From Swiss-Prot:
Residues given in the record as substrate binding sites: 298, 502
Family: In the N-terminal section; belongs to the enoyl-CoA hydratase/isomerase family.
Assembly and binders: Heterotetramer of two alpha chains (FadB) and two beta chains (FadA).
Organism phylogeny: Bacteria, Pseudomonadati, Pseudomonadota, Gammaproteobacteria, Moraxellales
A GO CC term assigned to this protein in UniProt: fatty acid beta-oxidation multienzyme complex
EC numbers for this chain: 4.2.1.17, 5.1.2.3, 5.3.3.8, 1.1.1.35
Protein name: Fatty acid oxidation complex subunit alpha
InterPro entries: 3-OHacyl-CoA_DH_CS, 3-OHacyl-CoA_DH_NAD-bd, 3HC_DH_C, 6-PGluconate_DH-like_C_sf, ClpP/crotonase-like_dom_sf, Enoyl-CoA_hydra/iso, FA_oxidation_alpha_subunit, FadB
Originating organism: Psychrobacter sp. (strain PRwf-1)
Residues carrying the site annotation Important for catalytic activity: 120, 140
Catalytic activity: a (3S)-3-hydroxyacyl-CoA + NAD(+) = a 3-oxoacyl-CoA + NADH + H(+); a (3S)-3-hydroxyacyl-CoA = a (2E)-enoyl-CoA + H2O; a 4-saturated-(3S)-3-hydroxyacyl-CoA = a (3E)-enoyl-CoA + H2O; (3S)-3-hydroxybutanoyl-CoA = (3R)-3-hydroxybutanoyl-CoA
Region annotation (Enoyl-CoA hydratase/isomerase) ranges: 1-190
Binding sites annotated in the UniProt record for NAD(+): 326, 345, 402-404, 409, 431, 455
3-hydroxyacyl-CoA dehydrogenase: region residues: 313-719
Length: 719
């Protein structure tokens, strides 16, 4: 044994070939945390002293090769000064460079995901062999940073500038065939043959059949392109990348490209220093703080959901009441994940609509070659459309997705409860109606919960699981488990009108209505909020949701929270609805919609809208600058999020932030409403609340904000 650690071992195989194996004891995956970095340094030192090693393979004992750096440890470094971050990165790179400089050939045997630091570990080897089930990539820009362990230096020298820029700037993981085509790996073999193939490559290097030293030398020298070729490569890459991501919102890809451009004409050691400076620059951006925080929040939400499933019942068959687009979407989602589901409606045309929706979604999967026609048929066969309850006796969970009317829901829920087994779970897909209220007609309210999917079901990852006053932990656990099985991210919330997401969204629409009443232009407001980072502005969003849905939801919310959600005037949204402008569903809302050449609705501002809005606009129109619009819209949204934490509707800032990003498209690079408040600063945020408090209760600072500001606290403590 050349080196023995609890993260890394280096053993000698036959013929002078060593095996550096990453094997983090007690961990499900290998990653570059502080202890692994320490042992990597020690292992390299041992190899530098070994005189009996002729070549080396790098392997993993886990299903994952190396998942990358430990993000939880990264956060503590990001709060340091840029110079300290640079030094930390340069020091780690010193070990990677020493490994690369070892006087014998090295081959990485990539058996699973080699991401971030894992990919960078393979790049310090001369050759890379990849298993046919593995993946490789540099996803750091998705966290607001970019590769810091030499990845931005070595990839342009291995796969070319244009390919390297795309790999790093998009953060997309590569499948084996893609990686081979790029030149990121040298061979793809069956998983079972991986170590043998890696050893064979090392033997060829030792025998002189492969010039491994030339391969290494390429990575140590500047990129071999003249200035004109470099300029063309970078110009093309920048145009492609910036068309996909706004560098003001997501600066990491731009910083990565700028950094690569600075170091491509340098040797490795100098280039590494440039990379470290670029990494520190990206790490100090608020977007990096937000996106790394988002990654950690995602882990937190998944852990909490897993804890909720401890008492879950087995689910062998589900049912959905109400077909149509929503029911069809729920049925599709269940069936596509292998779960048999009954879809019941009282009208055959609704069943046809539901099956049509499922068929359409599956057809698109076939078109994209993500599914074969045979698999599509098999998936569709898991959905059983029916007009009666004959098959409900053995169903484990029934999702009610009928019209958003409490009387109809009461009737349907009461009826189905008498037809299912005693321990079957009933879940309502209501978006606003109290679960506790809906449970009043049930004999077994403990088996009843809310399960709020977002539209379109196949695209929106969030499911709110709502706990009513009498909902049992088993019912919550089973519903959370079902959401996970359907490929969704469940967040458990307590019952109130609108639950979490809609309760927060409606004050945002209220703030929009008030701005329009006071003279703001809806097109201008949309542009400002889209520039802020929302995928669509509030006018466009309510058009997509449907003004009828919005008005109905607003009435429910006004009844639940009259102090801040019941306006004393008729707003633009209600006025347009009363004039039969429903949004995209009938072609006219705030905007007018016409189909483009691909059949997609295209919006244009409509003179008829402006004419109608004169009826709801104050005579003394005000002009609003962009920051005022942002402040007023975001205060209403963020204040209600904080009130949901105060009222224990949602348990943690992590869950609140993830729900808003996944449920309504809160700008991911801002990290969620709680992270946004932290970045504005609690004192500054409180001052904004006081500035706009005269507009109404929705703008007044929640007590939690006052208390936190007084105590100098934040939602996310600084590491």
């Amino acid at each position: 044994m050349i080196y023995q650690g609890n993260r890394i071992t280096v053993s000698l195989l036959d013929d002078g070939i060593a095996n550096m194996q990453f094997n983090a004891e007690g961990e499900s995956v290998n990653k570059f945390d502080a202890e692994t970095n320490k042992q990597f340094d020690e292992a390299v030192s041992a190899l530098e002293k070994a005189d009996n090693v002729k070549g080396l393979i790098v392997t993993s004992s886990k299903g994952v090769f190396i998942a990358g750096a430990d993000i939880t440890e990264f956060v503590s470094h990001f709060n340091k000064e840029a110079a300290e971050i640079e030094k930390w990165i340069v020091d780690i790179n010193g070990v990677f460079n020493r490994f690369e400089d070892l006087p014998f050939p090295k081959v990485a045997a990539i058996n699973g995901a080699a991401l971030g630091g894992g990919c960078e570990m393979t790049l310090v080897c001369e050759y890379r062999v990849m298993g046919d089930k593995a993946q490789i990539g540099l996803p750091e820009t998705q966290l607001g940073i970019f590769p810091g362990f030499g990845g931005s230096v070595r990839t342009p020298r291995v796969i070319g500038i244009d390919n390297a820029v795309e790999l790093i700037a998009t953060g997309k993981a590569q499948k084996p065939a893609e990686a081979l085509k790029l030149g990121l790996v040298d061979a793809v073999v069956a998983q079972d043959d991986l170590q043998e193939a890696a050893v064979d490559l090392v033997k060829k290097c030792i025998a002189g059949d492969l010039d491994w030293q030339a391969k290494r030398e390429e990575k140590l020298q500047p990129v071999k392109l003249n200035q004109l070729e470099q300029t063309m490569a970078f110009s093309t890459a920048k145009a492609a990348i910036f068309a996909k991501a706004n560098p003001k919102q997501y600066p990491a890809p731009a910083i990565a490209i700028e950094t690569i451009e600075k170091h491509v004409n340098l040797g490795r050691d100098e280039a590494i220093k440039v990379e470290a400076a670029g990494f520190a620059k990206a790490a100090k951006t608020p977007q990096a703080e937000s996106l790394v925080g988002l990654f950690l929040n995602d882990q937190t939400v998944k852990k909490l959901a897993k804890q909720h499933t401890k008492n879950a019942h087995d689910i062998n068959e589900a049912a959905v009441l109400g077909a149509g687009i929503m029911g069809g979407g729920i049925a599709y989602q269940a069936a596509s994940k292998g779960l048999p589901i009954i879809m019941k409606d009282i009208k055959s045309e609704q069943l046809d609509l539901g099956m049509g929706e499922a068929s359409k979604l599956l057809g698109k999967m076939v078109e994209r070659k993500k599914m074969t026609p045979a698999q599509m048929g098999e998936t569709l066969s898991r959905i059983r459309p029916t007009l009666n309850y004959g098959d409900f006796g053995e169903t484990d969970i029934v999702i009610e997705a009928v019209v958003e009317n409490p009387k109809v829901k009461h009737a349907v829920l009461k009826e189905v409860e008498g037809l299912v087994k005693d321990n079957a779970i009933l879940a309502s897909n209501t978006s606003t109606i109290s679960i506790t209220y809906l449970a009043t007609v049930l004999e077994r309210p403990e088996n009843f919960v809310g399960m709020h999917f977002f539209n379109p079901v196949h695209r929106m990852p969030l499911v709110e699981v709502i706990r009513g006053e009498k909902s049992s932990e088993e019912a919550i656990a089973t519903t959370v488990a079902l959401a996970q099985r359907m490929g969704k991210v469940p967040v458990v919330v307590n019952d109130c009108p609108g639950f979490l997401v809609n309760r927060v969204l409606f004050p945002y629409f209220g703030a929009f209505d008030l701005l329009l009443k006071q003279g703001a232009d809806f097109v201008h407001v949309d542009k400002v909020m889209e520039k802020f980072g929302w995928p669509m502005g509030p006018a466009y969003l309510i058009d997509v949701v449907g003004l009828d849905t919005g008005v109905h939801g607003a009435e429910v919310m006004a009844e639940g929270f009259p102090d801040r959600m019941k306006p004393d005037y008729k707003g633009a949204i209600k006025h347009l609805f009363e004039n039969n402008r429903l949004g995209q569903k009938n072609g006219v809302g705030f905007y007018k919609y016409e189909k483009d050449s691909r059949g997609k609705p295209k919006k244009t501002a409509d003179d008829a809208t402006y004419a109608l809005l004169k009826d709801t606009t104050d005579t003394d129109n005000q002009q609003f600058d962009d920051q005022t619009i942002i402040d007023r819209m975001m205060l209403a949204f963020c204040n209600e999020t904080v009130r949901c934490l105060e009222d224990n509707i949602v348990a943690t800032p992590s869950e609140a932030d993830m729900a808003m990003i996944m449920g309504v498209g809160f700008p991911a690079f801002r990290g969620g409403p709680c992270r946004y408040i932290d970045q504005v600063g609690l004192d500054n945020y409180l001052a904004l609340c006081e500035k706009y408090a005269h507009l109404g209760k929705a703008y007044e600072a929640p007590q939690k904000i006052r208390d936190m500001a007084a105590a100098g606290e934040t939602f996310y403590p600084k590491a």
